[in-house]
Amino acid sequence: RFRVGERVPELDTLAAEKGWAWLSAFNPGSQLLSESENLQRHQALLNNLVNTQRAFLPAASGDDTGQWPVEHAVCLLNIDEITARALAIRHGQAAFLHAQPGEAVRLCWV
């Protein structure tokens, strides 16, 4: 578990070349969808990552207050912010998280 503004040394080690990003395809544009719709969107994201041979780890996202549902997500390894932004846009997201090796996690708006 981590927060925006914190460093995550474990992920820095796994993504030492370009950094890493945290991305979900759930609830595009911050609009709540059904579980079924969200799972379809998540599968489309996974298919895209596999087809492009992008390295990733399964992940989940949520807020500490519980006001927003937990979302399936991915941690993309060795990905620059520009490429992560393109993926976020492709999958309808308003924002994603990104960190350069050795730097704090940043919230990146698309």
Features from the language model and the residues they span:
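Mid-chain, well-packed structural core segment of small domains
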Residues: V50-D80
